[in-house]
Amino acid sequence: MKAQPKASHFIGGAFVEDKAGKPLPVIYPATGEEIASLYSATPGIIEAAYAAALKAQGEWAALKPVERGRILRRTAEILREKNRKLSKLETLDTGKALQETLVADAASAADALEFFGGIISGFNGEFVELGGSFAYTRREALGICVGIGAWNYPIQIAAWKSAPALAMGNAFIFKPSENTPLSALALAEAYKEAGLPDGLFNVVQGYGDVGAALVNHRLTAKVSLTGSVPTGRRIMAQAGEQLKHVTMELGGKSPLIVFDDADLESAIGGAMLGNFYSTGQVCSNGTRVFVHKNIRERFIERLVERTRKIRIGDPFDEATQMGPLISAAQRDKVLSYIKKGKAEGATLACGGGVPKLQGFDKGFFIEPTVFADVTDTMTIAREEIFGPVMSVLEFSDEDEVIARANDSEFGLAAGVFTADLSRGHHVIGQIKAGTCWINAYNLTPVEVPFGGYKQSGIGRENGIAALAHYSQIKTVYVEMGKVDSPY
């Protein structure tokens, strides 16, 4: 299988190549096969992207918001028309099951474009009456914004970041993860087809040095990152030297709390969704599953039964429920955590190994894994693994589990399963996390903000809040009388 794009980069409305850049091979995670060969951006490529963005941004910002929104909504239509093609590309790029990419990737990107394209014309400033005189505020674009993506949801992340930025009148430069560089180029083509003026959405490929060059560029007004906490700290420090706006959507070790009155099958389904979807490579996953002692034994029994039925295999078989991890390095990292979990005394309830799959022996597969008898101090309960590894912990009462759930440097997400909605609201109100669910998990509609507390991030993706993060406020005071001056 091959998925070679026309060129590595997309700048000023056209594909651009510069083979002087460092080679960037693209690997299909299910087989280890190279499916494309790209090149990292050179300084010349980076400068060309900024020149194109600078040329286009002012005129774009001057358009009526409804006109900008119309182009975004047309882009959403194009993505939906091409959903199967884009989903197959995303499966090649990430290894995720086609069953998943058909509903969770380009489809979510289209939702974001449609939402921001529709809401931008109503996102206005304020009028303040001041007793004859008055003031008003304007929401204005920041200028050139940079997005740095992750490899778990490439096209979704590219759209979640670029849609609100473009809606507000900014230009956008996006660097995908070096592991998954392909679908951002497809998004660029969709923008072009929809009529987005050249230079407003640019894609530059590369490794960490390219990301650093974008962050440090004098024309960068804002940086939006989806990535790990260490990467976020580094980028925020770089951006802080020039006081640039930042949005950080980082890692997590989120709690999922199951009370003894919860619907057992629903809670197990939520826990599986919050640990095994995308082969566990989701930042908001509820990897610390706290189960009340009264139902712990039955919960684990049914969880193991259902987990063992997960179908692992060919990502392009729509019956497949779980594909491989993104890379050999990520697989080895996850396996090392499983080894550490066993060494520290956790009980391996199921999984923990590498499945034998005919035709995919060089792929980066791993079995969905459940640990029982996990304690709060174990490494697998403290550190983000980013793989299909669930830790089940026992609790006795509400106050106890709230305290333990909050005992983490992270605060991205949390979930509660209970038949008592009053208790559900109370517990969620005490949890220090930015994105929470009651009797559900990992549902992220674009209409609501997504982001975390503590080390899990700053700012928000999606919802009206995202528009605020891609804009700046200008206050205008209008004096209707004469100036009252003591001079």
UniProtKB/Swiss-Prot annotation:
Residue numbers bearing the Cysteine sulfenic acid (-SOH) modification? 283
Cofactor(s) needed, names only, are:
K(+)
Q: Which domain of life is it from?
A: Bacteria
Q: What keywords would UniProt list here?
A: Metal-binding, NAD, NADP, Oxidation, Oxidoreductase, Potassium
Does the record bear Oxidoreductase in its keywords?
A: yes
Q: Would I find Nucleotidyltransferase among this entry's keywords?
A: no
Which GO terms fall under molecular function for this chain's record? betaine-aldehyde dehydrogenase (NAD+) activity; metal ion binding
Report the Pfam families cross-referenced here.
Aldedh
According to UniProt, the reaction catalysed is: betaine aldehyde + NAD(+) + H2O = glycine betaine + NADH + 2 H(+)
Which residues are listed for NAD(+) binding in this entry? Answer: 149-151, 175-178, 228-231, 251, 283, 384
Which example biological process does GO assign this protein? glycine betaine biosynthetic process from choline
Q: What is this enzyme's class at the first EC digit?
A: oxidoreductase
State where K(+) 2 binds: 243, 454, 457
Q: Tell me the active site.
A: 161, 249, 283, 461
In the Enzyme Commission scheme, what number(s) does this protein have? Answer: 1.2.1.8
Which residues are listed for K(+) 1 binding in this entry?
27, 93
Q: In which pathway does it act?
A: Amine and polyamine biosynthesis; betaine biosynthesis via choline pathway; betaine from betaine aldehyde: step 1/1
Q: How is the cofactor bound?
A: Binds 2 potassium ions per subunit.
Tell me how this protein assembles. Dimer of dimers.
Q: What does this protein do?
A: Involved in the biosynthesis of the osmoprotectant glycine betaine. Catalyzes the irreversible oxidation of betaine aldehyde to the corresponding acid.
Q: Which family does it belong to?
A: Belongs to the aldehyde dehydrogenase family.
Q: Which NCBIfam families match?
A: BADH, PRK13252.1
Q: Specify the protein name.
A: Betaine aldehyde dehydrogenase
Q: Which organism is it from?
A: Brucella abortus (strain 2308)
Q: What is the lineage of its organism?
A: Bacteria, Pseudomonadati, Pseudomonadota, Alphaproteobacteria, Hyphomicrobiales
